[in-house]
Amino acid sequence: MSMTPREIVHELNRHIVGQEDAKRAVAIALRNRWRRMQLPAELRAEVTPKNILMIGPTGVGKTEIARRLARLANAPFIKVEATKFTEVGYVGRDVESIIRDLADAAVKMMREQEIQRVRHRAEDAAEDRILDALLPPARQGFGDEPIAREDSNTRQLFRKRLREGQLDDKEIDIEITETPSGVEIMAPPGMEEMTSQLQNLFSSMGKGRKKTHKLKVKDALKLVRDEEAARLVNEEELKARALESVEQNGIVFIDEIDKVAKRANVGGADVSREGVQRDLLPLIEGCTVNTKLGMVKTDHILFIASGAFHLAKPSDLVPELQGRLPIRVELKALTPEDFERILTEPHASLTEQYRELLKTEGLNIQFAADGIKRIAEIAWQVNEKTENIGARRLHTLLERLLEEVSFSAGDLAADHSGQPIVIDAAYVNNHLGELAQDEDLSRYIL
């Protein structure tokens, strides 16, 4: 990952509108990882990531920034809710399961990459197995060279027909390695590790057993291709690489961190919120967690915590946790101009998604500039009057706005015969105007 912070921000701008401070902070954090890897080994071990605390209302892009960052870095990533965890001793998940889940995500990511790498070899091997089932090898006989050549020519002809899909519906008998059926084990919260070990034990029983199936060629080809790809992947090497990737590149996003802050002057039931924070301390500071991959050191995993902090303040977190989240970034609430940009600027924007979805039914819709402006204004107004859910309000508005069009898309396509339906300000006011003005209606519908 050798992108500069400026390039990282430019890439994030393709998907997220505004929030420049947050983008700069995560871009620097990601670049510092690359810088650290260029250092001598002795100094590299001493440089730890500067963890980030994002503060801002819901729906402004906190989670999306972290998710896009992980995709850019091609790094193991996991998003967790702080409220799902409890202090050790209470019923609920303990915080170490975060690292176990991150390790599972790393293995899955590495396996997908490795399967992609060996895909062509797996396809060739799968083709050969299918051809063996279609054309059993000729018996060896005296002076069989011409037969072998003829067999080779026939095989190439069948290979060509196979690749062109002419044999897809032909049925063959083929031997497939059976996948052990998984055993679902219900266990109380906090015992995930034991459950995982039991599931692994049961799934290993009967592993490698083969069975002959009668399948169509196109179905058999997919199964055999997956089997050959799995055979070409070196599991031990894959796990070693996944372990290194978790330790050096892992990113953990902890949402709703404000919900485990103990608010000042608030009494009542409290299932040890402060205890969850104290359990998070060693994880963020650096400790060793036992996982299926082995012992994972968390010293160089990047932690990004986020919260709205409506009721609590960042200073309500325990001081030790505040110290372990040194970079503070405040994300701003969205303005009508931001909503307007969200509807048009990002790659695969909402308006583009709806346009392409309806195009599949032959219906052409166009969003006029004044229509987009009016949608943005209504989204902002409803957020101000009711709960502020940020950009998520646009999903609700657009679903409501295009409900009739989506329901009757096939009929409308026939009626308009290629002419576009224009979503302008008048159309928006006609479908959303009254709902936006009536606070009681907008509270329940928008």
UniProtKB/Swiss-Prot annotation:
Can you quote a single GO CC term? HslUV protease complex
Q: Name one GO molecular function term.
A: ATP hydrolysis activity
* Residues binding ATP, per UniProt: V17, G59, V60, G61, K62, T63, E64, D255, E320, R392
**What's a GO biological-process term for it?**
protein unfolding
Concerning SUPFAM superfamilies, the annotation shows: P-loop containing nucleoside triphosphate hydrolases
The text of the family note is: Belongs to the ClpX chaperone family. HslU subfamily.
Q: What is the official name of this protein in its record?
A: ATP-dependent protease ATPase subunit HslU
Query: What gene, per UniProt, encodes this protein?
Result: hslU
